[in-house]
Every structure is written in structure tokens, then in C-alpha cells.
Amino acid sequence: MKNQLLDAKVASEEQETVLRPSLLNDFTGQNQMKSNLKIFITSSIERDESLDHTLLHGPPGLGKTTIAQIIAKEKNVNLKSTAGPILSKAADLAAILTNLQKNDVLFIDEIHRLNIHVEEILYSAMEDFSLDIMIGEGPSARSVKIYLPKFTLIGATTRLGLISKPLCDRFGIHLKLNFYSCEELTKIVERGAKVLNVALDTNAAIEIANRSRGTPRIALRLLKRVRDFGIYQNINPLNQQITDYALNQLGIDKLGLDSSDHKYLRFIAENYDGGPVGIDTIAAALSEQRDTIEEMIEPYLIQIGFVQRTQRGRVITANALKHLH
């Protein structure tokens, strides 16, 4: 059971591991965050102590898992990985915590989805490095305190507002990851191409970067798909022409918007004259979960100025209407 809980998230992304930078100096973008993190890591190494508990937050695909792996690598300690939805019982978390060694890193992805009973176990573990476990049942039940080695909890979330204040306050380091610039994504695409042994010219890398929604995960995924088109058409190195063709075939427009984005924008434009319209109405019309819209569709549309969230609902901007037409 423990093996199913640990490394669940990382195991699902094993094929991506080779594309991830393993050291902070190799990590592209997020310069202010990276600079601060380097100071925190160096200080903890000099003090021979665990890094303070760290909360990483931001939209999906910006490198939260990679940062957790880098922290463990820079500290030269073990990394144990799991995810909030997997930890359904307090005993699940207790089993993981009691197997940690000094200064180890425990990474919990989607930490905002922790069961409240599991979350409460974390409070004493984070503050006092101890667990209070009930042994037995009924009148004979007794509480036993188990002391843990000092460790670092790294939590990752795309929904900072859903994390309870007691849990949020126990993280000594808060790091926000922002969308990447085209220049940063171009470097990431070029590095990924070298790792994958894919030849591409600068214009192709820029084209992929421009359509990647400011997100490295998407950039690397699109690179692989453009590579497939290049192999099929026997084009080497990849150039802007095959890149443009491939991305158009995939339904990715010049700003990186896909069919889901266009459906979202057109629904508001054509049915509500640009808004406002409530998120639940949008979710029902698009047959999507509200969380999916709020986490996967809206962040980038808001970032590029196409959507505004108001008290009355979602409103699309003049720039969005212009793009649709």
C-alpha cells in the first residue's frame, strides 16, 4: 500500500523526467523565485538543517514538481512524492511520515485536496515533528506520541484559496510560479529538443513557444507533436513551416488557444453578448467541471487579457472579441 501512495505523481510522469532540469542553475525562468530559493537552500545546508516547509502555488505545468525534485537534489536528500487525493486516511500519511529520514523531502501534489482528517495529522508533524496516534478502541484507547526526524514538507497547489489557513500558515516559505515569457519558453524548447535529439531551427522553437500558453509542460508536449509531423513528412531540421502546419492541425491557434478556449469564449460572446455570466452556467453549457474551467482554461485567458472575473460573473474583453473574429 505504501508503494502505491509514494511516488504516485512522479511515477505517472516518468517519461518526462529526462526533460526536467535537475539543478537550480539549469532551471529556466522564475528568476526572483529561483534567486530566493537558492538563498534558502544554501542557508539550510550551512546550518545542517532541513529546509523550512515550502508551499508552491501557481497554474498547472509551470514546474512545481520539478522544483520539489531540484530541492531534494540540491540538498542531497531523499524525495518521497504523493498526492492529496491519494491520502484518503490518516493512517496513509502516518505510514509515510514514520518512514522519513533526517532532512528528507516529502512532496504532496494537489495538497488542497487533502482530507481534513489527514490534514490535521500534518499540523503536529509540521510544527513539532511528532505524531499523536490512538492505539486501541473504547475505554482502553490511549494516545501515543511518535517523534519524527526533521523533514521538509513541500506542498503544491493550483488553488491556493482552497488551502485552509491553519495549514497555509505552517509553511515557512511561500513560492508563486508565474507564466513564462516567450523568450524563456524558447530556451526550454531548445533544451528539450537537444535532450530528445530533435533538430529544429530558431524560428520553429519561437513558434512553439508563442503557442504554449506561457507553460513549459505544454511547450514540451507541442515539441513532441511537431517532431512527429516532421518525421512523417521527412523534414529535418524542423522549421517554422512544418511547425505552423502541425500546430494548426492540432487546433492550436497563434496565441495558443485550443478548441476548449474558443468554445468558452464563443459561448459568452454569442449567448450573453460578452457577459457577465456565472461560472456554473458556463460549466453546464460546456459539459465541463467547474474546477477544470477555473484551473485549465481561465488562468491563461485572464493572463492575456481576454477574460475578467467580476462579482456578477465572467466577462470577455474587446480583445477577445477581436480575436474570435
Curated annotation (Swiss-Prot):
Presence of the UniProt keyword Translocase in the record: no
Q: Where is this region: Large ATPase domain (RuvB-L)?
A: 1-180
SUPFAM superfamilies with a match to the protein in the record: P-loop containing nucleoside triphosphate hydrolases (SSF52540), Winged helix' DNA-binding domain (SSF46785)
The entry's localization annotation reads: Cytoplasm
Q: Name one GO biological process term.
A: DNA recombination
Enumerate the Pfam families for this protein.
AAA_lid_4, RuvB_C, RuvB_N
Q: Which GO terms describe its cellular component?
A: cytoplasm; Holliday junction resolvase complex
- Keyword vocabulary terms for this entry: ATP-binding, Cytoplasm, DNA damage, DNA recombination, DNA repair, DNA-binding, Hydrolase, Nucleotide-binding
Instruction: Report which superkingdom the organism of origin falls in.
Output: Bacteria
Q: Where is this region: Small ATPAse domain (RuvB-S)?
A: 181-251
Family to which this protein belongs: Belongs to the RuvB family.
The name under which this protein is listed is Holliday junction branch migration complex subunit RuvB
